[in-house]
Amino acid sequence: MNRFFRENNIFDAPRTGGKGRAKSLPAPAANSPPSPVRPPPKSNIKPPTRISPPKQPMCTSPAKPLEHSSIVSKKPVVNRKDGYFVPPEFGNKFEGLPAYSDKLDFKQERDLRMHFMSDLERDIMKATLKFSTNYIMGYINSKDMRMTGKFASRPVKYKKTMEHMSDSRCTTCNYRFKDNTREWFLYVVVHIEKPLDDPDRIDICCQKCYLYHNVPKTSYEIYPSINLVDLSYLARERFFYQYIFPVSLEHTTEVKELRIDDHNCKVFEIIRRIIRNHKEPNERIQTIDLSTTGGLVLRETYTNIVLQRYRSMCTRPDVVDDVNCFILQEPSEMMAALQDNRFSGIKGTVFATVKVKKFTQVLDGAITFPLKPTTNNYCKLCKKTKLYYKNPVLYCTKCGFTNVYHFPEYSKFMYYFEAIKSFEMHNEMIIYYDLKMYKKLINIVNNNV
């Protein structure tokens, strides 16, 4: 009898084993104790390996549990398809479908503060969540990274077959995410004692190693959610790039004073009109104050906006609006005004004071991230030097994006979409940065200053 118990490991079975995931599993706390198991040294970490595309599509429906099975799995199973949290791949079934909440013209009265963000911030957050979702599922998809953001609506050249893909691993312990034996959390840990151009400054790690590092002040969650307040810190640490060029979130502030006469006592239409007519794509609205001659009537503001994989991480979504959705945890003053009808008696002029952040950089390229450099990641087209007639190669359909640490001399260059060129050969393509065109554009900018 004792032999049976030892072989089946009944007494030491993990809490998350069995049919489903334990409902009491909490999200990791910032002050959690580090893991007692030390990760292997950096020198032992294997580089990402190129992988083949899956022969079958990702599962989009919950797997049926085995009934009356006499087989006991000896491998710890953490992320079951019928578990407590919704699998990251479940949302792939909604890709390509339009979300009504993303459209400002949608007439249903709702919280409009997600439209306060600038296009720059929205594109970065969406690209980051797309990258982290693929990463937590076990792979890095270069084509997805290239087609996210503004490129999704452009006639961009791409291969009908798969472009470059590679395994995703925890850069601390080398855990392969496709093994799917750990919780669905992904973190960026910044080691601030190392220089900005050091590839070991940033770790993309699993939950276990996040707890091991135990540096909550320089750690940021990127799956299942990413916070707007974290963007400025991650940009400062050079986590966002346009190809090999760092993304800057430098900005100025501005206050706009507006006068609204034809409001018809409809506060929802007032807010929507301000967003549509008085907000530029590179601006983020911080607060909107609506007042009359009698004083302040409403202040619509927020402190944080969260982009989350699912509106409820414990409930499988039925509509596309509940996938990759922006969430505000603070109550909306505008929605409260709709409930108490405080604008119903206002007949005169409404004065609006709009405080905005105006970002100086335009995001017009593919958004990439600082992955660990890999050896022998080149082909006959992009070459070992990653140069095309002395121009830096930014992307190869066979080898993926050029590592952001490969050309440190270009890290201070400005990104111009007009300098992006391509060359095709043998059903493959490279994208490179035309330095002659770049110099012409720089001279034009300097002459206009």
UniProtKB/Swiss-Prot annotation:
Entries under InterPro entries matching the protein: Baculo_ME53
UniProt region (Disordered), positions on chain: 1-68
Pfam families per UniProt: Baculo_ME53
GO cellular component terms, A-Z: host cell cytoplasm; host cell nucleus; host cell plasma membrane; membrane; virion component
Presence of the UniProt keyword Nucleotide-binding in the record: no
Source domain of life: Viruses
Places the protein is found: Virion; Host cytoplasm; Host nucleus; Host cell membrane
Zn finger region (C4-type): 379-399
Pro residues bias (residue ranges): 31-42
Entry annotated with the keyword Signal: no
GO MF terms, alphabetically ordered: DNA binding; zinc ion binding
Function text: May act as a packaging protein or as a structural component associated with intranuclear baculovirus virion assembly.
Protein name: Early 53 kDa protein
